């Protein structure tokens, strides 16, 4: 009977040696050096405890309750993580916990052999070595910017591209994909034209243009319910209820719907004697009544005064023209001072009779296509939204680069917008 009492103690000792071997094997794989020393010290302490016969009941309790001291010298929490002895930090791996403890001890074993730099984390040393080698593995997907640290890339996205992380309910469409599509759709909009999407941090707000309020009383039966639904946000700005709704109701789709509604309206005939307006049936919402090459030339020649005809005076800017500049580009001037251009040599200028100030043929002019047939500001804005900002003959819908204004007009007449 006296020989059977030491059996539970021998079982605990054998199990403790087994845990010591397994921990030593894990520390060898992870490259931890301090873990071996602590394991040997704890093994020696466990051997002394076996000789005294005092620590065995506590070991049995720690095995049953999943808490207490392990062979590597760290306390384990109830969820199985290793707890820091200095604070409440807990980690599943020994190597990560040892790196955390170096914050408390101030140890920096990872040193650069080219300069006095030292760090407690190996990944920080790897990022530092890129400053000596010149390696830049992180590249921005929106521009040619490259950097050696991931944090610098995140700072570049926030500062340069106004990209901020979207915090809210998770949806089927990832935030990165949504931002990428929005940046591709709106990156070519000019600064002189009012953008429909405000990409400034901290929120992304889809705004309703102010000029719709000025022109809706002139054009009947215009449905702006889509803009009203997109403009229902807080005064300080807020995110839409669902990113999927933002992708469906993006500004290009809204312009396409608006163009389809405008095409069904009868044309306004403010100046019956002016042959500038070329009626053209369109089958697609985004064709925007693009005329042929001869029609464009005839429209330009009809709007240019002859040598015997007087030139038109400069119109005064209206309320909507002061707040909105329809001519885009770095060399553009305000629309209030935009007069009818002349081709070739200078035409003789003589006093002319006063024309109506609100004549749309004088207020809306595309300098890239040399077209004057825009009846109102809405059609002009839709047309200018089709031009790219950096390259005016690049399609803002599909990114297709055209050679000149005739190729650009034919591209929209065909209506083949294949996303690249």
Curated annotation (Swiss-Prot):
<keyword id="KW-0479">Metal-binding</keyword>
<feature type="region of interest" description="Disordered">
    <location>
        <begin position="223"/>
        <end position="247"/>
    </location>
</feature>
<keyword id="KW-0678">Repressor</keyword>
<feature type="compositionally biased region" description="Polar residues">
    <location>
        <begin position="262"/>
        <end position="273"/>
    </location>
</feature>
<comment type="similarity">
    <text>Belongs to the Ikaros C2H2-type zinc-finger protein family.</text>
</comment>
<feature type="zinc finger region" description="C2H2-type 1">
    <location>
        <begin position="82"/>
        <end position="104"/>
    </location>
</feature>
<feature type="compositionally biased region" description="Polar residues">
    <location>
        <begin position="223"/>
        <end position="236"/>
    </location>
</feature>
<keyword id="KW-0832">Ubl conjugation</keyword>
<dbReference type="GO" id="GO:0006357">
    <property type="term" value="P:regulation of transcription by RNA polymerase II"/>
</dbReference>
<dbReference type="InterPro" id="IPR050589">
    <property type="entry name" value="Ikaros_C2H2-ZF"/>
</dbReference>
<keyword id="KW-0863">Zinc-finger</keyword>
<feature type="compositionally biased region" description="Low complexity">
    <location>
        <begin position="290"/>
        <end position="311"/>
    </location>
</feature>
<feature type="region of interest" description="Disordered">
    <location>
        <begin position="262"/>
        <end position="356"/>
    </location>
</feature>
<dbReference type="GO" id="GO:0000978">
    <property type="term" value="F:RNA polymerase II cis-regulatory region sequence-specific DNA binding"/>
</dbReference>
<dbReference type="GO" id="GO:0005634">
    <property type="term" value="C:nucleus"/>
</dbReference>
<feature type="cross-link" description="Glycyl lysine isopeptide (Lys-Gly) (interchain with G-Cter in SUMO2)">
    <location>
        <position position="5"/>
    </location>
</feature>
<keyword id="KW-1017">Isopeptide bond</keyword>
<keyword id="KW-0805">Transcription regulation</keyword>
<protein>
    <recommendedName>
        <fullName>Zinc finger protein Pegasus</fullName>
    </recommendedName>
</protein>
<feature type="compositionally biased region" description="Polar residues">
    <location>
        <begin position="332"/>
        <end position="349"/>
    </location>
</feature>
<dbReference type="GO" id="GO:0008270">
    <property type="term" value="F:zinc ion binding"/>
</dbReference>
<keyword id="KW-0804">Transcription</keyword>
<comment type="function">
    <text>Transcriptional repressor that binds the core 5'GNNTGTNG-3' DNA consensus sequence. Involved in megakaryocyte differentiation.</text>
</comment>
<keyword id="KW-0238">DNA-binding</keyword>
<dbReference type="InterPro" id="IPR013087">
    <property type="entry name" value="Znf_C2H2_type"/>
</dbReference>
<comment type="subunit">
    <text>Self-associates. Interacts with other family members; IKZF1, IKZF2, IKZF3 and IKZF4.</text>
</comment>
<keyword id="KW-0862">Zinc</keyword>
<dbReference type="GO" id="GO:0003700">
    <property type="term" value="F:DNA-binding transcription factor activity"/>
</dbReference>
<dbReference type="GO" id="GO:0003682">
    <property type="term" value="F:chromatin binding"/>
</dbReference>
<feature type="zinc finger region" description="C2H2-type 3">
    <location>
        <begin position="138"/>
        <end position="161"/>
    </location>
</feature>
<keyword id="KW-0539">Nucleus</keyword>
<feature type="zinc finger region" description="C2H2-type 5">
    <location>
        <begin position="393"/>
        <end position="417"/>
    </location>
</feature>
<keyword id="KW-0677">Repeat</keyword>
<dbReference type="InterPro" id="IPR036236">
    <property type="entry name" value="Znf_C2H2_sf"/>
</dbReference>
<feature type="zinc finger region" description="C2H2-type 2">
    <location>
        <begin position="110"/>
        <end position="132"/>
    </location>
</feature>
<feature type="cross-link" description="Glycyl lysine isopeptide (Lys-Gly) (interchain with G-Cter in SUMO2)">
    <location>
        <position position="185"/>
    </location>
</feature>
<feature type="zinc finger region" description="C2H2-type 4; degenerate">
    <location>
        <begin position="364"/>
        <end position="387"/>
    </location>
</feature>
């Amino acid at each position: 009977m006296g020989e059977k009492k030491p059996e539970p103690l021998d079982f605990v000792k054998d199990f403790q040696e087994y845990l010591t071997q397994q921990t030593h094997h894990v520390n060898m794989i992870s490259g931890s050096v301090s873990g071996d020393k602590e394991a040997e010290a704890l093994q020696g302490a466990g051997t002394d405890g076996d000789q005294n016969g005092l620590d065995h009941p506590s070991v049995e309790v720690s095995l049953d309750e999943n808490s207490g001291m392990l062979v590597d010298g760290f306390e384990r929490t109830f969820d199985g993580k290793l707890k820091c002895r200095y604070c409440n930090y807990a980690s599943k791996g020994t190597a990560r916990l040892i790196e955390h403890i170096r914050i408390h001890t101030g140890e920096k074993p990872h040193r650069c052999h080219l300069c006095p730099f030292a760090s407690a984390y190996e990944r920080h040393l790897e990022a530092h070595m890129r400053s000596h080698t010149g390696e830049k593995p992180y590249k921005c997907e929106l521009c040619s910017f490259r950097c050696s640290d991931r944090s610098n890339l995140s700072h570049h996205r926030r500062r340069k591209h106004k990209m901020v992380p979207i915090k809210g309910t998770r949806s089927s469409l990832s935030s990165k994909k949504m931002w990428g599509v929005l940046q591709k759709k709106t990156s070519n909009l000019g600064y002189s034209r009012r953008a429909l999407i405000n990409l400034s941090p901290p929120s992304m707000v889809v705004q309703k243009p102010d000029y719709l309020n000025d022109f809706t009383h002139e054009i009947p039966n215009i449905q702006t319910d889509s803009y009203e639904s997109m403009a229902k946000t807080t005064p300080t700005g807020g995110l839409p209820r669902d990113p999927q709704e933002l992708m469906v109701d993006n500004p290009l789709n809204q312009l396409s719907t608006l163009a389809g509604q405008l095409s069904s309206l009868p044309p306004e005939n403010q100046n019956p004697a002016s042959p500038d307006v070329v009626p053209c049936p369109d089958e697609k919402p985004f064709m925007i009544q693009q005329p042929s090459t001869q029609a464009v030339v005839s429209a330009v020649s009809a709007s240019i005064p002859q040598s015997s005809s007087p030139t038109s005076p400069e119109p005064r800017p209206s309320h909507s023209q002061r707040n909105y500049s329809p001519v885009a580009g770095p060399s553009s001037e305000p629309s209030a001072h935009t007069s009818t251009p002349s081709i070739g040599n200078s035409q003789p200028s003589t006093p002319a009779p006063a024309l109506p100030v609100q004549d749309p043929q004088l207020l809306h002019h595309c300098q890239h296509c040399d077209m004057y047939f825009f009846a109102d500001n809405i059609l002009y804005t839709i047309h200018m939204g089709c031009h790219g900002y950096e390259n005016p003959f690049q399609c803002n819908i599909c990114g297709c680069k055209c050679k000149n204004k005739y190729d650009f007009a034919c591209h929209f007449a065909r209506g083949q917008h294949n996303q690249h």
